[in-house]
Amino acid sequence: GTVFFDQDSPDSPVKVTGEVTGLQKHGFHIHEFGDNTNMSADGSSYLQVSGSKLTQEGQASMEVKGNAGARVAXGVVGIAK
């Protein structure tokens, strides 16, 4: 699937949209760098998230720490031009 992170300006909320297919319900976990060689499971999900507490810059950036559970799939986050 594909997930998009859009932010019009540093002061505007981040809009997260995407569609991933074949997944059971799980947490959504993103790392700047990571090993995606440990992939398994096939699943599906649609998501759209936005809010003033989401930002891609500064102290309040989307860096959240927690336990999302076992990895069921992995992907690469890149910048589209």
From Swiss-Prot:
Gene3D superfamilies listed in its UniProt record: Superoxide dismutase, copper/zinc binding domain
Protein name, as recorded: Bursicon
Compartments it resides in: Secreted
Principal location: secreted
PANTHER family the UniProt entry points to: SUPEROXIDE DISMUTASE CU-ZN -RELATED
GO biological process: chitin-based cuticle sclerotization; cuticle pigmentation; superoxide metabolic process
Tissue spec: Central nervous system. Coexpressed with CCAP in most CCAP-specific neurons. Coexpressed with pburs in the large bilateral lateral neurosecretory neurons of the first three unfused abdominal ganglia and in all anterior bilateral cell pairs in the thoracic ganglia.
Highest taxon, organism lineage: Eukaryota
Subunit (UniProt): Heterodimer of burs and pburs.
Pfam families per record: Sod_Cu
Segments passing through the bilayer: none
Function: Final heterodimeric neurohormone released at the end of the molting cycle, involved in the sclerotization (tanning) of the insect cuticle, melanization and wing spreading.
Example of a GO MF term: hormone activity
Record-level GO cellular component terms: extracellular region
Species of origin: Periplaneta americana
SUPFAM superfamilies per UniProt: Cu,Zn superoxide dismutase-like (SSF49329)
Chain's gene name: burs
Record-linked InterPro entries: SOD-like_Cu/Zn_dom_sf, SOD_Cu/Zn_/chaperone, SOD_Cu/Zn_BS, SOD_Cu_Zn_dom
Keywords for this protein: Hormone, Secreted
